[in-house]
Amino acid sequence: MPSSNGPRQATRNKLKNDARERGTSPPQRSIEEYDDGEKVHLKLDPSVPNGQFHPRFNGRTGTVVGEQGDAFKVEIEDGNVTKTVIAAPAHLRRQQA
């Protein structure tokens, strides 16, 4: 059988919650606010399908550069290229100082 070339290929572990994290996510995570210039970690939450970014960028750290609707624009470095990822607040974690 030919292999899949879809955007969710090779994401069996990236899009799977651990046993203790199953069920609905904490609602506080979905209404979190971030300021411009703040460092955030990109972490996909599989139980929230809306506002997911491409799984290729899972685990990256970037800087919030603005808002787009309810989501945030995050700039990340991909090699020598700066890319902008749009992600809902449920998929972002604030970097600890």
Curated annotation (Swiss-Prot):
Q: Return the GO cellular component terms, semicolon-separated.
A: ribonucleoprotein complex; ribosome
PROSITE patterns from the xrefs? Answer: RIBOSOMAL_L21E
Disulfide bond sites: none
In this chain, composition skew of type Polar residues spans 1-12
- Region annotation (Disordered) maps to 1-35
- Keyword Transmembrane helix recorded: no
Mind listing the UniProt keywords for this protein, alphabetically?
A: Ribonucleoprotein, Ribosomal protein
- Output the InterPro entries linked to this UniProt entry: Ribosomal_eL21, Ribosomal_eL21_arc, Ribosomal_eL21_CS, Ribosomal_eL21_sf, Translation_prot_SH3-like_sf
Q: Which GO terms describe its molecular function?
A: structural constituent of ribosome
Organism, by scientific name, is Natronomonas pharaonis (strain ATCC 35678 / DSM 2160 / CIP 103997 / JCM 8858 / NBRC 14720 / NCIMB 2260 / Gabara)
Q: Which residues form a coiled coil?
A: none
Lineage here is: Archaea, Methanobacteriati, Methanobacteriota, Stenosarchaea group, Halobacteria
In terms of HAMAP family, this protein maps to: Ribosomal_eL21
Q: Which family does it belong to?
A: Belongs to the eukaryotic ribosomal protein eL21 family.
Q: Can you say what this protein is called?
A: Large ribosomal subunit protein eL21
Q: Name one GO biological process term.
A: translation
